[in-house]
């Protein structure tokens, strides 16, 4: 499982029934850890004095937890982009000098927007390699706060990183977002969690967030399960030929603040019915087929970019033409996801095209398929979203499948429990 050159060959089940164990939400887990650590610091207590419950066990969350708990002089976050952004802001307001670094790919993921904003607030941050990219040396101290303006169309994680430290700033924070604001549900999730822990934080207008100086409250935080991870089971339900297929997904709830809960709406157009239930006091979702798929899907993913690979893969397998917009952040994710999708679907004979630099378009064009395994580019969502395509391409092979540990460590075991056969 740890061999970089491992390849899994997948054979789908004839019937799709059962209960699927989902990981806890990575987005909520990482925010809960940072807020909990800041709450403890405000009371001169050690970080992680009170641990959130049902914490995600994915790589991103584990490296964040270890960094907050141990605070080593050199923090290596591996490929965890969320950890890089959130911890950079956290370290800027935390006494001590730390170096934060990661994989070679991480050293090519831009962070200048966040660093520049933190410097405006008084942070002492030095680039140790190429200007604008990790690794960083962060010398933490009390920051004054004030007014900062950053682009709203780059990454909502820059916004969330700044917002979460804002209650610790002497003068609070007025954060102005320029241009189109992408992934707004993730910003709303951050603000909601901050308020749950006692912060005075909210939108002052359509493009400005105001956070007043006020210590966080220490709180036992229970984390719900992950809608992003549920999307791959929606994909499986959409693609299976089992008309009586039924999956139970515990730990998902109606009214979730997670942006990727939009998956239930999108997949209602791709043949999947979502039923909310409560069994023995636990909220959950039951998936069934509704046998209603649109003839074409046009959609703007500006608020849920992490669903793009799942929906592109599903539409390609079902032969549904599409035009998808709002994908500008996909080029700075774990890989260039737009190019990765284009190259890997071509191996399956699907010729998607890129328009306007970031739009993905497919009108049914085909190309000559190859027998090469699907490459994952060290990107968990490539492996996660392509695996259910074995319903359409039995025997589909995926290279470097262990990348799923970044967000869904037990994915392959859950696939096997659901009846998929996995051959190495």
Residue spans for each PLM region:
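Short, structured segments at the rim of ligand-binding sites
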Residues: 1-424
């Amino acid at each position: 499982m740890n061999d970089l050159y491992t390849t899994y060959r997948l054979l789908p089940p004839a019937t799709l029934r059962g209960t699927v164990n989902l990981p806890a939400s990575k987005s909520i887990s990482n925010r809960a850890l940072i807020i909990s650590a800041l709450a403890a610091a405000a009371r001169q207590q050690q970080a992680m004095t009170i641990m959130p419950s049902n914490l995600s066990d994915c790589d991103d969350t584990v490296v964040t937890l270890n960094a907050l708990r141990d605070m080593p002089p050199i923090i290596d976050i591996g490929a965890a982009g969320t950890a890089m952004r959130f911890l950079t802001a956290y370290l800027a307001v935390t006494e001590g000098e730390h170096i934060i670094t990661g994989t070679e790919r991480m050293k090519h993921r831009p962070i200048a927007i966040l660093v520049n904003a933190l410097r405006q607030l008084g942070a002492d941050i030095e680039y140790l390699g190429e200007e604008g990219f990790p690794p960083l040396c962060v010398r933490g101290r009390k920051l004054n706060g004030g007014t900062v303006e950053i682009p709203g169309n780059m990454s909502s994680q820059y916004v969330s990183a700044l917002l979460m430290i804002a209650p610790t700033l002497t003068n609070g924070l007025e954060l102005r977002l320029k241009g189109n604001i992408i992934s707004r549900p993730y910003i709303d999730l951050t603000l909601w969690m901050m308020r749950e822990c006692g912060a005075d934080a909210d939108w002052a207008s359509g493009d400005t967030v105001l956070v007043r100086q006020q210590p966080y409250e220490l709180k036992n935080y229970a984390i719900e399960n992950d809608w992003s991870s549920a999307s791959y089971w929606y994909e499986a339900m959409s693609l299976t030929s089992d008309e009586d297929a039924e999956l139970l997904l515990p730990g998902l709830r109606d009214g979730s603040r997670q942006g990727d809960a939009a998956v239930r709406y999108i997949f209602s157009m791709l043949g999947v019915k979502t039923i909310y239930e409560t069994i023995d006091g636990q909220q959950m979702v039951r998936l069934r087929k509704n046998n209603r798929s649109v003839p074409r899907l046009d959609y703007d993913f500006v608020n849920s970019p992490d669903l793009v690979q799942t929906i592109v893969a599903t539409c390609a397998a079902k032969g549904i033409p599409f035009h998808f917009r709002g994908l500008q952040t996909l080029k700075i994710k774990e890989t260039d996801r737009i190019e990765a999708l284009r190259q890997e679907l071509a191996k399956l004979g699907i010729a998607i095209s890129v328009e306007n630099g970031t739009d993905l378009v497919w009108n049914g064009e085909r190309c000559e398929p190859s027998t090469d395994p699907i490459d994952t580019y060290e990107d968990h969502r490539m492996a996660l979203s392509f695996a259910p395509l074995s319903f359409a391409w039995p025997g589909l092979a995926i290279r470097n499948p262990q990348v799923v540990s970044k967000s869904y460590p037990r994915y392959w075991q859950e696939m096997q429990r659901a009846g998929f056969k996995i051959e190495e």
